[in-house]
Regions:
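...captures the hydrophobic TM-helix bundle architecture rather than a specific catalytic motif
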Residues: 1-3
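Soluble extramembrane regions of membrane proteins in the secretory/endomembrane system
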Residues: 6-195
Length: 195
């Protein structure tokens, strides 16, 4: 039975890239050898707080489609992942962590348009003037790297100042700003890792 399993578990390659095989490639990270799939999953969890990226959702007029295209039509406002009533009959296309990592490394211009950066603190949203844009998912807000890029240096400086405080002494705003800055730095490291 174990000899037959590999023959039965062949997967079909779509879109020219075998993301499952890519995910099995070993990399040295933090002094340990890990498969790229683990790097992708852990990175996506740190950045987005989830392991898969929804590619589709609702526009302001409840039009269903590609989130980035809907964002362009509506100036980034009024986007949601899916309403409760849609949960039972609309399943958004989602990007597997390894597919996302391949995009980040090989097609960064495409990856920069994915809504992965989570910001939930109202004061931070107001400071960055992002409260009316992004994608809403049950009260959580997600943004693209394109939307976050103007704030990279500001958040990096904030992280340096906040990092001097003990983690237990940080207020919710500082924790949110620190986490967002870390997510942006991690994304940038991944984005330029093959260059």
């Amino acid at each position: 039975l174990f000899a037959i399993k590999p023959l039965l578990s062949k997967h079909e390659v779509k879109d020219g890239f075998d993301h499952l095989a890519f995910g099995k490639l070993p990399v040295l990270l933090g002094g340990r050898i890990k498969p790229l799939d683990s790097v992708a999953r852990n990175s996506l969890l740190q950045i987005a707080g989830q392991q898969r990226i929804a590619l589709e959702g609702n526009g302001p007029d409840k039009e269903w489609g590609d989130l980035y295209e809907l964002s362009k039509k509506a100036d980034g406002t009024g986007l949601t992942y899916q309403s409760f009533s849609q949960k039972f009959h609309k399943r958004p296309k989602k990007l597997h962590p390894t597919q996302w990592l391949m995009e980040v490394m090989m097609e960064p211009d495409v990856a920069d348009k994915r809504f992965i950066f989570q910001i939930n603190h109202p004061e931070l949203l107001t400071e960055l003037q992002l409260e009316n844009v992004g994608v809403d998912k049950s009260g959580l807000r997600f943004y693209t790297f394109e939307q976050m890029q103007p704030f990279v240096m500001l958040l990096h400086k904030k992280k340096q100042v906040i990092g001097q405080k003990d983690a237990a002494e940080r207020n919710p705003y500082e924790r949110a700003a620190f986490k967002l800055a870390h997510a942006l730095e991690l994304y940038i490291q991944l984005r330029y890792s093959l260059q």
